[in-house]
C-alpha cells in the first residue's frame, strides 16, 4: 500500500500538527462566561465583623449575646455617656443579661426534679395561704378567670405553630366522611 496516495487525498481527517486548536477552547470560553462574577461574602450586608453575627459559629452565638443596639436601648438616656464612668462601673453597665443567660439562670434555680424554685413570696401570696377555705371553695374551682389566665400564660409560652394548632377548628377523625370505614362492595 502506498502511503503517499493516502496523504494526498482530500478527505478531512482532522487538524494536522500545525493547525490551530480553537474548537476545544470554544466550549471552555463559553463555560467561563457562565460562571458568576466574584462577589462579596453573603454576610457582609448583615453585620459588621465586630459583631457576633459574623464568623464560623455565628449561628450558635447569636442567641447567647445580645446585639449592642439592644443594650444601648436598654441603657436608655438615663445612663448618659459612659466616658465619665470608672472602668469597673462602665463594664458592669454594659453587661446586661441576654435571653440565653436568663434561661440558664432560671434553669439553675430549678430543683433537681425539674420543678421551679420560687425565691420569695409576695404579701398577697402569704395572705392567701392563711385562708385555705377560700382557695378550696367550689367558686374557685369553677371560676373562669383563673383558668383563662392560666390558659393565656401557657399559650404565651408555646411556639407560634402550636398556638395555631390550639386555635384551629377541632375536628375529630370520626366526624370526617373520608375517615369512616366503609365495606367495599
UniProtKB/Swiss-Prot annotation:
InterPro entries reported in the protein's UniProt record: Neuropept_BW_pre (IPR013297), Neuropept_W_pre (IPR013299)
One GO CC term on file: extracellular region
Function text: Plays a regulatory role in the organization of neuroendocrine signals accessing the anterior pituitary gland. Stimulates water drinking and food intake. May play a role in the hypothalamic response to stress. When injected into the lateral cerebroventricle, it elevates prolactin (PRL) and corticosterone and lowers growth hormone (GH) release.
Removed propeptide positions: 74-185
Keyword terms, alphabetized: Cleavage on pair of basic residues, Neuropeptide, Secreted, Signal
Protein name as catalogued: Neuropeptide W
GO biological process terms on file: feeding behavior; G protein-coupled receptor signaling pathway; neuropeptide signaling pathway
Pfam family, one: NPBW
Primary site of residence: secreted
Signal peptide: 1-41
Localization in the cell: Secreted
One MF term in the entry's GO annotations: G protein-coupled receptor binding
Entry's family note: Belongs to the neuropeptide B/W family.
Organism: Rattus norvegicus
